[in-house]
């Protein structure tokens, strides 16, 4: 029997305010130059006409004031045009990173975005490869997708789509935040204790179906505190309290119809307001209840077998009869 536990307490701290413009970047220990920036500087060195077209001044001629002397063994000026000189050329042209703008950021830390860019303020703008930055961003916990643009002369724009936390998943005594695709998010579960709690192996892959089902019955949904997936086939709901709340055992087939019937019965007989511990709807056409004084409840106990009660309605045309567990067979 799995034990449904309370989620960890939410830490008391203020949430970091969002910054959509990140003008100040931390100084990195290294500047990573991409082949594009190096290639453009190389072409500027070899072809002055092309340098004018792309907005780069060609390097000064060897021997002229301010020129660089190629290293020993270099065959021509192009081979002597190193990474450091490329960075200086780009800086002289004003193509340096001065500002980062971000849209779509809510849960992703600004420092993580700057770290993915990897070039400090004042570094060469052409040293930033948008595709490489996009890959780094999409590896962050909250980022589902990202788009990166270099905007001349001095700006990088980042547009991200974040993953939406859907539920807390408890498995083997541990908690994790999951999104609508059932993927775990590397986030502090204590910050999301108000999310629905799903329990059991395979629960993340079926959680979206459950929440869509509950959306159709908001009166039930607002009372659900936990849902346990049994055998990756059906759900058992805990209402009002995780520890000792009302247990509702849904059937494997057509749980939506079962919830509809439960709402109808509650409207007629105020069933959910009675002193019950279990409402069992696993058998078609039959609803079994257990009074709270009948003893503790195992929310994951399975029905070994059994047939619908004689004369039970077929096809869910009207609410099934209510049978107390002590009066009817619960095989």
From Swiss-Prot:
Periplasmic side: 46-331
Membrane topology classification: Single-pass type II membrane protein
GO aspect biological process, one term: FtsZ-dependent cytokinesis
Residue ranges annotated for the POTRA domain, each copy included: 95-163
UniProtKB keywords: Cell cycle, Cell division, Cell inner membrane, Cell membrane, Membrane, Transmembrane, Transmembrane helix
InterPro entries assigned to the protein according to its UniProt record, in alphabetical order: Cell_div_FtsQ/DivIB_C, FtsQ, FtsQ_C_sf, POTRA, POTRA_FtsQ_type
Recorded GO CC terms: cell division site; plasma membrane
Pfam families per UniProt: FtsQ_DivIB_C, POTRA_1
Biased composition (Basic residues): 10-19
Cytoplasmic side stretches: 1-24
Summary of the function given for this chain in its UniProt record: Essential cell division protein.
PANTHER family listed in its UniProt record: CELL DIVISION PROTEIN FTSQ
Name of the featured protein: Cell division protein FtsQ
Organism, as annotated: Rhodospirillum rubrum (strain ATCC 11170 / ATH 1.1.1 / DSM 467 / LMG 4362 / NCIMB 8255 / S1)
Source taxonomy: Bacteria, Pseudomonadati, Pseudomonadota, Alphaproteobacteria, Rhodospirillales
Recorded name of the encoding gene: ftsQ
């Amino acid at each position: 029997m799995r034990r449904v536990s309370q989620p960890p307490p939410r830490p008391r701290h203020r949430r970091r305010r969002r910054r959509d413009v990140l003008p100040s970047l931390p100084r990195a220990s290294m500047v990573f130059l991409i082949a594009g920036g190096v290639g453009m500087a190389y072409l500027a060195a070899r072809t002055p006409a092309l340098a004018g077209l792309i907005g780069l001044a060609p390097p000064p001629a060897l021997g002229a004031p301010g020129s660089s002397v190629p290293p020993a063994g270099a065959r021509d000026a192009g081979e002597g045009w190193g990474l450091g000189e490329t960075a200086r050329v780009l800086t002289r042209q004003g193509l340096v990173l001065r500002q980062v703008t971000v849209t779509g950021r809510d849960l992703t830390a600004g420092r993580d975005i700057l770290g993915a860019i990897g070039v400090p303020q004042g570094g060469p703008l052409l040293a930033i490869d948008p595709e490489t930055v996009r890959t780094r961003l999409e590896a962050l916990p909250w980022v589902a997708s990202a788009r990166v643009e270099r905007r001349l002369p001095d700006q990088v724009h980042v547009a991200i789509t974040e993953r939406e936390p859907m539920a807390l998943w408890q498995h083997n005594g541990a908690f994790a935040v999951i999104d609508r695709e059932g993927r775990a998010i590397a986030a502090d579960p204590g910050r999301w204790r108000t999310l629905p709690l799903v329990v059991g192996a395979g629960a993340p892959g079926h959680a979206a179906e459950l929440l869509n089902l509950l959306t159709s019955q908001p009166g039930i949904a607002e009372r659900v505190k936990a849902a346990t997936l049994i055998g990756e086939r059906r759900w058992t709901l805990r209402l009002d309290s995780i520890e000792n709340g009302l247990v509702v055992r849904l059937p494997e087939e057509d749980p939506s119809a079962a919830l509809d019937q439960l709402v109808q019965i509650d409207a007629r007989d105020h069933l959910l307001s009675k002193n019950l511990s279990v409402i069992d709807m696993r058998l078609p056409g039959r609803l079994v209840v257990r009074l709270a004084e009948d003893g503790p409840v195992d929310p994951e106990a399975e029905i070994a077998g059994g047939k619908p009660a004689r004369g039970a309605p077929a096809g869910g045309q009207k609410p099934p009869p209510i049978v107390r567990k002590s009066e009817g067979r619960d095989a």
